A protein has these predicted regions:
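Active-site hotspot residues in diverse enzymes, especially metal/ion-binding acidic/histidine motifs
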Residues: 1-164
Length: 164
């Protein structure tokens, strides 16, 4: 079970975190009965800057999974781009290469130290869409059986994944 606790409305952020956590599972970083809590969910959770070898490997796994290739980076040769321009370029690239445009934007933001621009482009890409957390949490609470879980587990789930 992967619980998304990053308070981001971005589908791209949430898909990266899921891919990162799947990486931990696929790479054998956790035992079947072990609970893993990834507490660093800021920019570094995307940046490959965490000094922990397992975290770097899970990040690399996620980037490869989301791009279909390892070590993917996206840059800007013009040096001057608007949020709309970045969103449009990411959408075109994403369609042509079957890569989520939001992931292209996050990757671009990290590698070009352009987080404000990236977050503005993410908002444009997600215009009119429900925030990721609302949809994911709704699915969790529709599928989970609280009657078979301990009360402290249910309390934790309500704190990290509140029902809307």
């Amino acid at each position: 079970v992967i619980i998304l606790s990053k308070k981001s409305k971005s589908w791209a952020w949430q898909s990266f975190i899921i891919a990162h956590e799947i990486g931990h599972c696929a790479l054998g970083h956790i035992d079947p009965d072990e609970i893993l809590i990834d507490e660093t969910l800021g920019e570094q959770s995307y940046a490959l800057d965490d000094p922990d070898v397992d975290e770097q490997a899970a990040d690399q796994y996620a980037i490869t999974l989301l791009n279909g290739r390892a070590n993917a980076t996206y840059g800007n040769s013009t040096g001057n781009m608007s949020a709309l321009g970045l969103a449009d370029a990411a959408m075109q690239y994403g369609k042509a290469n079957r890569v989520d445009p939001g992931h292209v934007v996050l990757n671009f933001a990290k590698h070009n130290d352009a987080w404000a621009l990236g977050m503005a482009a993410i908002k444009l890409l997600q215009a009119g869409e429900k925030p990721a957390g609302i949809v994911v949490n709704d699915l969790l609470w529709r599928c989970i059986r609280p009657d078979v879980l301990p009360d402290d587990t249910i309390d934790l789930l309500y704190r990290v994944a509140p029902a809307e």
